[in-house]
UniProtKB/Swiss-Prot annotation:
Cofactor(s) required for function per UniProt: siroheme; [4Fe-4S] cluster
Annotated source species: Xanthomonas axonopodis pv. citri (strain 306)
Positions with a binding annotation for [4Fe-4S] cluster: 425, 431, 470, 474
Cited Pfam families: NIR_SIR, NIR_SIR_ferr
Designated name of the protein: Sulfite reductase [NADPH] hemoprotein beta-component
Function (record text): Component of the sulfite reductase complex that catalyzes the 6-electron reduction of sulfite to sulfide. This is one of several activities required for the biosynthesis of L-cysteine from sulfate.
Length: 568
């Protein structure tokens, strides 16, 4: 018997449910229905291989159930030793691949139920956990990708890690179920001062950005912290609230939203403001209609002023006026970059964040070889790429040799500008929500679009491209200059008009169309862009479409654009 998510949470004994009984049931590869909800809070989703679902049904077999496990790695920072251990876990328990997510976490795919506990224990043995990586809690905290670049970046990362730890659930269920922690008096009734017995109405996302780079797409987060730097010193943070990408096709009651900047806080006020925002959403969020439960809808339903006043009341102080800041782009900086301390940082382009050995590339083996050098650290970016950080100048040649040998940076060195700025969610065959391909389709669509770009002299012009297999928007498609949002197998909504800074939503241009129709719609627009764009100001494709009147932001019940003139 299925129950509402709210009932499942409140009756779960702090996220325990019957997970242990489900895991012990050898008759099926699945969990009990309610436990499929609860395991998300432990960092895992039950999935099945949709490529073979119909065949298994014909054979009267249950679906090929498997589990995705997601790490909690604030800012995506791990050591070479941890990398090697995670590589081993992917090879032993998962599908021989690692995947970098758009929130700087790792995902393991293809873990079967009888090996789920052993996999969880192996991950925790690396001093990485998966607690609260999924579910109606604060998820993995994003951070500007390279905290070693300067002391201010390092402080930013430390602050993000503090927020991540502060917002972890108090329940010991995770440690009891996966790590065999001994149960003590009060087990199942732990106090959850931030979350309460029902946790949050929906998932909650936090990002820390360091201008002028908006690699975290901070305005897509429920709560954003924008570092205010003066003369290299971190003074504090502008606070943004109410971003979110998810929507439902054809449902006027759901929409993506760009966050509002509501003021400035000092570093000392960081945990207080985070707690105030999260608990405001806990108490004001819509628990009756799950599709309307994200913080963005709470703000739109109650009004921004009401929510900001409530946050200030709970924090015990009013936010100061927002400080000036400006972003110039939301991509990654590829190649070697030198930090303030003389250490070097190499950003590698990894298409869709997938790290595997295939017929055309040996990314898993190559990164294993770099990790075995034991130099620097590994830092995942919010654009699904990877930074080899903190490398001595004397060690660069060794890293470069391995990069060349394994073809690790093909995405940067030989691929197109389009590929370097592209992202895609996993979608088929594992995501249960996917309506169309995304990760597996990205290379093919890029190859189909590239001749049009070359035809119009745009082959090396950066264009932000994102593919999503469904309207939930895990790849943050609604901020892209060009986005394909899956509608059905082989059919997509074509969204146009985001910008390179992550500050403006795109809008629907064509609905439910196939690849030939997508290319036919884009060709005349690319031709006009090539002929009429403002070269002097490096005008982006999305900005041009707005200036030329090709598209416009329609009347909309929510926040769609951050006004650039306020941020200079």
């Amino acid at each position: 018997m299925s129950h509402s998510v709210e009932d499942i949470k409140s009756e779960s004994r702090r996220l325990r449910g019957s997970l242990e009984q489900s895991l012990a049931d050898a008759v099926t590869g699945a969990l009990r229905e309610d436990d499929q909800t609860l395991i998300k809070y432990h960092g895992s989703y039950q999935q099945d291989d949709r490529d073979i679902r119909d065949e298994r049904r014909r054979q009267k077999l249950e679906p090929a159930y498997q589990f995705m496990i997601r790490t909690r790695t604030p800012g995506g920072v791990i050591t070479p030793t941890q990398w090697l251990a995670l590589d081993g876990i992917a090879t032993r328990y998962a599908n021989h691949s690692l995947r970098i997510t758009t929130r700087q976490a790792f995902q393991f795919h293809g873990v079967i139920k009888r090996e789920l506990k052993a996999t969880m224990q192996a991950i925790n043995a690396t001093l990485i956990d998966t607690l609260a990586a999924c579910g109606d809690v604060n998820r993995n905290v994003q951070v500007a990708a390279n905290p070693l670049l300067s002391q201010a970046h390092a402080t930013l990362y430390a602050d993000a890690a503090r927020v991540s730890e502060h917002l972890l659930p108090n329940t010991r269920a995770y440690y009891e179920i996966w790590l065999d922690e001994e149960r003590v008096s009060g087990s199942g009734s732990e106090d959850e001062p931030i979350y309460g017995e029902r946790y949050l109405p929906r998932k909650f996302k936090i990002g820390f950005a360091a201008p002028p780079l908006n690699d975290v797409d901070v305005f897509a987060n429920d709560l954003g912290f924008i570092a205010i730097l003066r003369d290299g010193q971190l003074l504090g943070y502008n606070v943004s609230i109410g971003g979110g990408m998810g929507a439902s096709h054809g449902d006027a009651e759901t929409w993506p939203r760009v966050a509002n900047v509501i003021g400035f806080v000092t570093r000392e006020q960081l945990l207080d403001i985070a707690t105030a925002v999260v608990t405001t959403q806990r108490d004001f969020g819509n628990r009756a209609v799950r599709k309307r439960a994200r913080f963005k809808y709470t703000i739109d339903d109650h009004g921004l002023d009401t929510i900001v006043a409530e946050i200030a009341r709970r924090a015990g102080f009013a936010l100061q006026p927002a400080q000036p800041f400006a972003f110039d782009h939301n991509g990654d900086r590829y190649g070697w970059v030198e930090g303030e301390d003389g250490l070097w940082h190499l950003t590698l382009s990894l298409p869709a964040g997938r790290i595997a050995d295939t017929d055309t590339a040996a990314h898993l083996s190559g990164l294993r070889a770099i990790a075995q050098l034991n130099v620097g650290e590994f830092r995942m970016t919010p654009n699904q790429n990877l930074v080899i950080a903190g490398v001595l100048a004397s060690e660069r040649a060794r890293v470069d040799a391995l990069v060349a040998h394994y073809g690790l940076d093909a995405g940067n060195q030989s691929a197109t500008a389009l590929a370097r700025g592209a992202m895609a969610c996993v979608a088929l065959p594992t995501c249960g929500l996917a309506m169309a391909e995304a990760e597996r389709y990205l290379p093919d669509f890029g190859a189909a679009l590239q001749p049009l770009l070359q035809q119009h002299g745009l082959a090396e012009t950066p264009i932000v491209l994102r593919l999503s297999g469904c309207p939930n928007g895990c790849s943050r498609p609604y901020l892209a200059e060009i986005a394909l949002v899956g509608k059905a197998p082989g059919r997509y909504n074509l969204m146009l008009g985001g910008d390179r800074r992550g500050q403006r939503l795109n809008t629907l241009y064509r609905e439910n169309i196939t690849e030939p129709e997508i290319l036919a719609a884009l060709e005349p627009l690319l031709a006009r862009y090539a002929a009429e764009r403002d070269h002097a100001n490096d005008e982006g494709f999305g900005d041009f479409l707005h200036r030329a009147g090709v598209i416009a932001l329609p009347p909309y019940p929510t926040h769609r654009r951050l006004d650039l003139e306020l941020l200079a």
